[in-house]
């Protein structure tokens, strides 16, 4: 159509020129008609190019809408989920005991060692027995954990949880210990929270011994009273391993403890 329009336009101009203008004028009009023709052709070529690009864009867009993103695809810096299944937290295993439940580090093993009165559960780190979890259940005449007083007062009544001093004798003050003392305990934090209508005590304690090679032990204690029983969960790790990542396992285990 572009060339046909150009031919008709050029013929009309030429015949009009032949009747009214000299030869030189005819050449000028023909030249203009050629430019018009060229412009029309270029315009149609541009339209054709735009149409092809538009069609390609629509095709790509339709393909994107019609396809599903593969679960294995991952953004830069992220690991691909090759099998396309939702990721689960495999660091902990849920444990349900008689009247309580707790999240136990998955790489810790059950232990038969009995260290505390009323102990019903014990798990230890596969590579370091200093990192462990214990649950104790003992009878009590208290109706609530708050009947023991403040968290600090409660701890003084169950101080056996922190371990006993094995050596008794005269010693000089050394390494921050008092005279004749080879062990110390510092309460780092206490907290009281209501869970399911029951108050819970949370305590963070750092214990140290003169011969300890771990720089001390971080001990987290969770306690509550339910149905005439005192429930205590104690999780701990050595100070050195605490700052190398063991803290997240101990903290999760202690704070996950709850009674039915």
Swiss-Prot record:
Q: Name one GO molecular function term.
A: calcium ion binding
- Keyword list, A-Z: Chloroplast, Membrane, Phosphoprotein, Photosynthesis, Photosystem II, Plastid, Thylakoid, Transit peptide
Q: What is the top-level taxon of the source organism?
A: Eukaryota
Carrying Phosphoserine, the residues are 150
What inducers act on this gene?
Answer: By light.
Cellular compartment(s): Plastid, Chloroplast thylakoid membrane
* Gene Ontology biological process terms in this record: photosynthesis
Specify the transit peptide boundaries: 1-74
Q: What Gene3D superfamilies does the record tag this protein with?
A: Mog1/PsbP, alpha/beta/alpha sandwich (3.40.1000.10)
Q: Which family does it belong to?
A: Belongs to the PsbP family.
**PANTHER family hit by this protein:** OXYGEN-EVOLVING ENHANCER PROTEIN 2-1, CHLOROPLASTIC (PTHR31407:SF6), PTHR31407
What exactly does this protein do? Answer: May be involved in the regulation of photosystem II.
Which named protein is this?
Answer: Oxygen-evolving enhancer protein 2, chloroplastic
Q: Which species is listed as the source?
A: Sinapis alba
What's the name of its gene? PSBP
